[in-house]
Each structure stands twice: as structure tokens, then as C-alpha cells.
Regions:
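Active-site-adjacent structural elements that line small-molecule/cofactor binding pockets in enzymes
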Residues: 1-262
């Protein structure tokens, strides 16, 4: 099982976040992930560095660790703009990027306050949000395709298309993501965690390299293959554990995970 780290880029000054990313690379984490939020309010922070700006800065500060977003809300950016941004990040990072995407929330809810404040249009029906996610995936793939439409000549295109992973909380989206993308991610305490992942894997046709990942809170011991939680995930077919450090990153704690990774 690959062990990754996710940081909250609203939790600390950039210098501390940069050092945490470097520490994660030195410790042997597979990838470093961040959030796609415009405001730090949800995390009790007074600010939030923008998702792709900070991931690009980590790309410049590191050389080998994978990089990813968990997850990019597909309502936050027009698909063509997202394709351009991701192509740029993939080039700058040396093909280390994975695009994690999510369908987002309904309008006028606690989870949509940022988008409501910025007058970003949202879709009330979950089925429509799932359709939007599938549409975005299709647009990305068409812009990145070797035989893309002539209207996209001159638009940046990654030499290696980044994997696309979908954050899922429902069986409908798990199955759809399994068929359309390169992986899924769900939360560690989802009551249907194992079944969601199994549904996505089945929908993928048990495709080689399909990424079935789970995020949890940052607990260094979870990286230990002998830890009961680690073994529980492995038994469910989890290929990647992404540990999320919600608060200001503790560089020493991050470094301590090296004992389980090397």
C-alpha cells in the first residue's frame, strides 16, 4: 500500500508548508496532496492558499514526490481552464501530478458557502452534479487527446496525461468513476467504505493500475504494515492511504513516518 500525505494549505505560512512538503519527500511518502478551497473558514483558518498555485510551488520545491489535489471541485473552474491549468502543472512538476476531482455540493448548504459567496453557479441535484463531473472528464480528455479538435491547437497538452481520481461518497458515482477514470478515493469512516471501493473496482473491469484509495487523519502509525487499520485497508483492496494533517504541519512527525516507508 502506498502511503501519502495531505496538507491543509490554510493551516500555516507558506515557508512551513514548503518545509513540510520537502520533509514528506525525504521521508518517502508517495505523494503530497492539498485541498481545493477558496476560504480557510471551514478549517478555522483566516486564509487559504489557492489549490493549484500552492501545488505548483511544491513542485518547484521538490523533485520526486508525487503531487495531487484532493479534491478539485469541478464547479470551481470551467473545464477548459482546468485543462490548461493541469497541463501546466504536469509540465512544471515533471509529470508528477494526479488530478483528484469531486462533484461538489448543492447550493445554499454549509459545504457550498465559498461558492455561494463568489456567485459560482452550483447544481441542486446530485445526479446533475455527477453528470457535470463526467462532462468535465470528457472535456479534459478531449483537449489532451493526440487527435484533438483543431480549435485547440496551441493549447498546452501534457506529454503524459495525469491520472484522474474521483472522490466518491455514493455507489452511483463510485461506479461511474470506476468506468471513466483512473481511480477513486473515499473517507476512512464512510459506513460503506469497502463496498464503495469494490463497486468502483468492479466498474473499472479490474483494470490494472486502478487506484482505490482512502483518506484518513494523519496518524504516523497507520503507515506501519502491522497496524490493525493498515491491515484492514489492505484486506479491502486499498492501494493507497492518504493521511490528512488538518492543522499546521509537524515536520518532525512527518519525518517520523520514514521508519515505516524505507
Amino acid at each position: 500500500m502506498i502511503i501519502d500525505l495531505q496538507l491543509n494549505q490554510g493551516s500555516a505560512p507558506w515557508s512551513q508548508l514548503r518545509d513540510a512538503g520537502i520533509a514528506a519527500e525525504e521521508a518517502g511518502f508517495g505523494s503530497l496532496w492539498n485541498l481545493d478551497h477558496f476560504s480557510g473558514e471551514m478549517f478555522g483558518a483566516d486564509s487559504m492558499l489557492e489549490c493549484f498555485t500552492s501545488i505548483t510551488a511544491w513542485a518547484a520545491a521538490t523533485s520526486s514526490i508525487g503531487l495531487g489535489t484532493l479534491v478539485t471541485n469541478v464547479m470551481n473552474r470551467e473545464p477548459g481552464l482546468l485543462a490548461n491549468i493541469v497541463s501546466s502543472v504536469q509540465q512544471i512538476s515533471g509529470n508528477r501530478f494526479t488530478l483528484g476531482i469531486g462533484a461538489g455540493a448543492a447550493p445554499n448548504t454549509a459545504f457550498s458557502a465559498e461558492q455561494d459567496a463568489l456567485a459560482i453557479s452550483l447544481l441542486p441535484r446530485m445526479a446533475d452534479r455527477h453528470d457535470r463531473l463526467a462532462e468535465v472528464v470528457g472535456t479534459l480528455q478531449s483537449i489532451w487527446s493526440a487527435d484533438r479538435d483543431a480549435s485547440f491547437v496551441g493549447f498546452p497538452r501534457p506529454h503524459i496525461a495525469p491520472p484522474i481520481v474521483v472522490g466518491v461518497n455514493s455507489f452511483a458515482l463510485a461506479r461511474r468513476a470506476g468506468a471513466l477514470t483512473d481511480g477513486v478515493n473515499t473517507r476512512f469512516n464512510h459506513p460503506d467504505r469497502g463496498a464503495l471501493l469494490a463497486a468502483a473496482i468492479e466498474a473499472s473491469g479490474h483494470r490494472a493500475g486502478f487506484d482505490a484509495s482512502v483518506w484518513s487523519w494523519f496518524v504516523p502509525e497507520y503507515a506501519d504494515p502491522t497496524h490493525p487499520f493498515h491491515q484492514e485497508l489492505a484486506a479491502e483492496g486499498v492501494t493507497r492511504l492518504i493521511m490528512f494533517e488538518r492543522g499546521a504541519p509537524d515536520v518532525d512527525a512527518i519525518a517520523s513516518v520514514a521508519q515505516y516507508l524505507n
